[in-house]
Amino acid sequence: MDVILLERIEKLGHIGDVVAVKNGYARNFLLPRKKALRANEANRKIFEANRAQIEADNAARRTDAEKESEVVNGLTVTLIRQASNTGHLYGSVSARDLADAIVEAKPEAKVAKNQIVLDRPIKSIGISEVRVVLHPEVAVKIKVNVARSPEEAELQAEGVDVMNQMFERDGASFTEDYDPNAEPGLATEAEEAVADADDNAETNSEESL
């Protein structure tokens, strides 16, 4: 389907561009959200008659978004979640969770969940970078610190790899104890002596029977 864009659409085009898109994308997203018009003769005339106003409205929204970006850009939000010993969350962090966290941290920010761009789900503890699209032409990045406790979040904020630290600690607990001063072969000889003693005991027991 050919449509006339009413705003910039990433990887698609700018205001006034006529582009070909899949029917489902147009019907389910572009048209109902008033981001585009069907590219027929009647709509072309309507667009050209209102183009100046459409562009002025877009510029005003962009200016507001640029002001908001000064508040949101570079922000770090912390989310405390339950997770397994391997760091996997019991459930993922959603776009709504992030939008709510941003507004809680910066009440003056008006960020909606549909402005959060999650390239991949956040399913484990750690620090992730997430893009927030405040306007089709204005995007910023925030950091998301997901941890199991405020103390853990603070360590991560300081650059500590909490999971790696935990694995190293657990691995150390399974290290076999040894005497660095022992002579090579002594342990083996002692084990063989014990085994021989056990064999002799079994033999004597059988002979007595």
Curated annotation (Swiss-Prot):
Gene3D superfamilies: Ribosomal protein L9, C-terminal domain, Ribosomal protein L9, N-terminal domain
Pfam family, one: Ribosomal_L9_N
Positions in coiled-coil regions: none
Keyword set, alphabetical order: Ribonucleoprotein, Ribosomal protein, RNA-binding, rRNA-binding
RNA-binding is among the record's keywords: yes
InterPro entries hit by this protein: Ribosomal_bL9, Ribosomal_bL9/RNase_H1_N, Ribosomal_bL9_bac/chp, Ribosomal_bL9_C, Ribosomal_bL9_C_sf, Ribosomal_bL9_N, Ribosomal_bL9_N_sf
Biased composition (Acidic residues): 189-209
Listed SUPFAM superfamilies: L9 N-domain-like, Ribosomal protein L9 C-domain
Annotated Gene Ontology cellular component terms: ribonucleoprotein complex; ribosome
Signal peptide: none
GO biological-process terms attached to the record: translation
Positions of region (Disordered): 169-209
A GO MF term: rRNA binding
Matching NCBIfam families: L9 (TIGR00158)
Job description of the protein: Binds to the 23S rRNA.
Protein family according to the UniProt entry: Belongs to the bacterial ribosomal protein bL9 family.
Protein name per the record: Large ribosomal subunit protein bL9
Species of provenance: Zymomonas mobilis subsp. mobilis (strain ATCC 31821 / ZM4 / CP4)
